[in-house]
């Protein structure tokens, strides 16, 4: 049984806040001091008479007994007191209290209240400092190694020590008194609705205002330790709570009608599942985040949710689970008596800072105000050194996660992060575009690789390093291909809601032609109509995504734009008609009424055009002889634009090295004979490659010369034998005659 002490109804809460930090809030706390508001000379006087400076409160428990309370008058002259009293509504009469009870949603009245008993275990790898007899101190007060596993001190990395102080519940009509303390703010934009959130060391809260027809309504969600907040009269935590546990409560604060409507989309059964399985396990919280997103995507795919039926409540399941995980990761008090597994920290902390990017795909924008974290930066640098990622040769998921967290904590992409990200992106692209198996590969054979592609996209978009940005976006546009679309479609059917399974390199690439119709044209072996609905939804929510990162203007996606390719410092617009000022190259082998144009623009500045444009000279090439002993030169990086006569634009292939060209030459079965290619070189040359064996290789290396001599000798010897045989046969026929 869960037992809570209920305060007396007539108790007046007096909240005194002492702080040395600057607090950003509606009330200016600079006037709050720790000394008494009574004059010092009055207190030190021999004959103290406090009566003129006191206010007396007398409460009768019966006719003969009463309790008397004296409070200094100066308390009521305080600006802070006036501010708090404005939120208390103490002058309202009983009828107003009654109306509020009927107006606001209460779980106990509506029959939705439940007490939750946690059944699952917290599987977070902790190590008790007092029970570990022999540990290796890797870094004093920060890292230890026990039985081959590294552990960390959660403090100060997993704390809000670097965050600004702020005020929560500052609106005059809130049912909770203002709370002052350290907090991390986040925002989510969904159409015309802006959702505000605060993560503190004691709770997390979310508030948004939306429209029900023409009437606006406000709803606040609260999860955490309700003992750390004070509700306004006549409410207490028990009145507003829908779920209560030993340490944390879940409250919904809103009027009856809007909350009932919200609960049609926001399923309390999913929250119950999370809480019963143990929400104190952060990894468990994120499993529920991904499962909620998986269910949301499933509804988009089957048509239950479309663009016209979108509303904020459809994302509240995943948003609340994410907020709970964030709060648990940073809550107070930290596990000061326990060390925490570093591998677990890296994974959960990466999820915490990457999930907002996932929300960006299905809402219009999500922002978390993360401060600069000096202690955390120092800690991550230690881990990068300990795990041997400083020389950029060890490219794996953990290394990328560490460099990503370094970017998050310091707020900018430094050269070391850019170098690691650049190499990692090249490695991923080569792995799946030019695979060693010599078979068509897709990204979803490893969900970590899919997640890493999304992490790299985030680093690139947030970087001021244009070389890195162009490199990542170009390669991810290339990875938005038929194999990866089919792989993603199947991964969403496997009922395996992992983070990587939810993502596609198409989501924030520079490819804009993937309508449901185009996907049907590209993939004819099976119907991907449900996948087309998903791509259309993300395209709608992330309109012109990544475009303004490479262009100084915005091109309309529905006006013939197919893709954008950034080759070295050149930008090419691939479209079904000329749409920007520049040098325009037209593909040759397209059907009637089907066109493909490539426009090279200057200085990333695009000016929209309608009809008049400058033709570029496209050189037709049947074979292209390359020397493997030489550098790539103007051919690296370069882009092959693939298209077909009846389908039009298929995709792009990025060439980063001479090995990529050699791979294409040796694995022509991976490149359909029905396709044609425009080759965009970085020296402003555009070639049209014709035929199926357009790359021929030569070499001047000694080994190759010896090999060629042997081959030529064999050819000469074979010809000699054929001629000899022919001559012998003719001679025999002559003799017979």
Swiss-Prot record:
It is a single-pass type I membrane protein. The chain crosses the membrane at residues 703-723. This is Envelope glycoprotein H. InterPro entries: Herpes_gH (IPR003493), Herpes_glycoH_C (IPR035305), Herpes_glycoH_C_sf (IPR038172). Glycans are attached at residues 62, 212, 365, 412, 448, 465, 544, 569, 603, 683. Keywords: Fusion of virus membrane with host cell membrane, Fusion of virus membrane with host membrane, Glycoprotein, Host cell membrane, Host endosome, Host membrane, Membrane, Sialic acid, Signal, Transmembrane, Transmembrane helix, Viral envelope protein, Viral penetration into host cytoplasm, Virion, Virus entry into host cell. GO terms for cellular component: host cell endosome membrane; host cell plasma membrane; membrane; viral envelope; virion membrane. The gene is gH. It is found in: Virion membrane; Host cell membrane; Host endosome membrane. N-glycosylated, O-glycosylated, and sialylated. The heterodimer glycoprotein H-glycoprotein L is required for the fusion of viral and plasma membranes leading to virus entry into the host cell. Following initial binding to host receptor, membrane fusion is mediated by the fusion machinery composed of gB and the heterodimer gH/gL. May also be involved in the fusion between the virion envelope and the outer nuclear membrane during virion morphogenesis. It comes from the Viruses.
